[in-house]
Amino acid sequence: NQVRRSELVRKTMRRDKKSHMQVLKFGGTSVANAKNITNVVEIVTKALERDRTLVVSSAISGCTDKLISIGNLAAQRNDEYKVLIDDLQQKHYEIISDLLPAERQPEARAKVDEVFDSLKAITLGVTLLGELSLTSLDAIQSCGELLSTKIITIKFLSMGISAKWLDSREIVKTRCENGTNVVDTSRTYANIESVLDKYPQNQLFIVPGFIASDFQGRTTTLGRGGSDYTASLFAVGSHARVLEIWTDVPGMMTSNPKIVPSARTIPHISYRAALELSHFGAKVIYPPTIQPVVSEGIPIYVKDTFHPEAHGTLIEKNPPRAKEKVIGISNSDNIALISLEGSGMVGIPGFSSRLFDTLSRNDTNIILITQASSVHTMCSA
């Protein structure tokens, strides 16, 4: 009851509190190299003309996958992981050289070296143990977002823009439930409000996406769509007027443009329709990660980093009524259909449960179930 009361109080405060914050989230392709980061900087600089801005960034494209490979190779005591670490470090050095003025490069390299020193220490421990624990894997994966955001922060500082880097591990708090990291939203929102109140003069904040920590201070990660989730949490916690998700596509499309060349960008769409399209294949947003802003009624703008002048897609509770009867068509790839038939199924208690339990143990998600009224046939996808 106390938790529910505090949630009601927080929502009332949000309605009453005038917001001057906007949250911009950039994905891995948006920060993949110096040229792309320059695009990001231009977008953020223009955004600062409107409101205070909080930027959430993913790791550079491909970095997280490489970090996972590094962890697995270290657990196998395969020295190839050291080569991958060196390659990744060199990649970030190249971004620094291409992005920053000469006088700021030593500072950026020092920040990058700190992260890689930590990575090397963790992987050495993994090698000695011959085991990659979930805690170690989370710590290894966290390096990607730490690297990208520290470089981006120094870029803004080199331009005379007072950017404040915030460590999301100290703000976003998780607890373990059934082996899964679950965000403690009440504590997280309180932390966000508290840290932003400490810097009332700052107009720009840079935050690593995807990473958090538990109540013992151990680094944790937020799973698929983790950076979007981070952005959603900060949007709610900062009482943002809008969440902008900047990616490498022009917004939500009427259909997959790789399949339907005439597909168009959907300019306005409701939360419900956007979540439905995303559930069935549209990969612009991942429904669980944007649920916090949907619950609070914060608009979501999906925009193209490489064509910032394009309208994009505005996702909101009550969009303008569309002329088209069908808003969009989505598709799901790599789907297997399992059909079970036979008289042996009839009248057997728990038969469906046994099937679903078997699929669950093999990390297989079910998106569709049909069953004949005779209970003679059942299909799952």
Residue ranges and their predicted role:
Residues 57-72, 253, 302, 307-319, ...:
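Terminal amphipathic helices with adjacent charged low-complexity linkers/tails
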Residues 286, 297-304:
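Acidic/polar loop patches that form or flank catalytic/metal-binding clefts of enzymes
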Residues 3-290:
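Nucleotide/pyrophosphate-binding catalytic subdomain
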Residues 242-246, 300-302, 367-368:
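Short hydrophobic alpha-helical runs that function as membrane-insertion/retention elements
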Residues 159, 296, 362:
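Conserved dinucleotide-binding and phosphotransfer motif residues
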Residues 310-381:
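A conserved regulatory-domain signal marking ACT and ACT-like small-molecule sensing domains
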